[in-house]
Amino acid sequence: MSNKNYDAIKAHYAGSDARDLAAMMAPITNGTAWTEMAGFPYAGTYVGPDAVIDGVFKRIGEDWDGYTFTLEKLVDGGATIVGIGTYSGIYRKTGKKMSARVVHVWEMQDGSALSFEQFTDTRLVAAAMG
């Protein structure tokens, strides 16, 4: 039996791989609370798709070359979906490469994201920026 929450997040990551922002934002609603970890350069909670795009994705695009999230495992917990993988990229201002393990925790309802929370090694990201 298919889980539409799992399928929605699987499609989000497929959109990320294809650099398709619309596909990435499909499960994000006006009420989705998207939290970037404290210590991360874009730390904070952004509510709704416009805030996520402006506060996170546009800034990543401006600051990094080749920034990617490589999904290695997607865990179907029903209403909780967990993506495990690696961030990588080159910080434009320093030319330094970064690779950091990351976990994304999604709380879902009927294929829509209620919340997203990121956990990553912010020190590795900061080292590339400094």
For each predicted feature, which ranges?
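Pocket-edge positions in alpha/beta enzyme catalytic cores
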Residues: 1, 44-45, 117
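A beta-strand edge to alpha-helix "cap/lid" segment located at domain peripheries
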Residues: 4, 57-130
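Short, mixed-charge, low-aromatic patches
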Residues: 7-17, 41-44, 60-64, 84-86
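Hydrophobic pocket/interface hotspot
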Residues: 9-12, 24-25, 32, 48, ...
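Short, electropositive, low-hydrophobicity segments enriched in small/polar residues
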Residues: 19, 23, 52, 89, ...
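A solvent-exposed, acidic/Ser-Thr-rich amphipathic alpha-helical stretch
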Residues: 23, 27-79
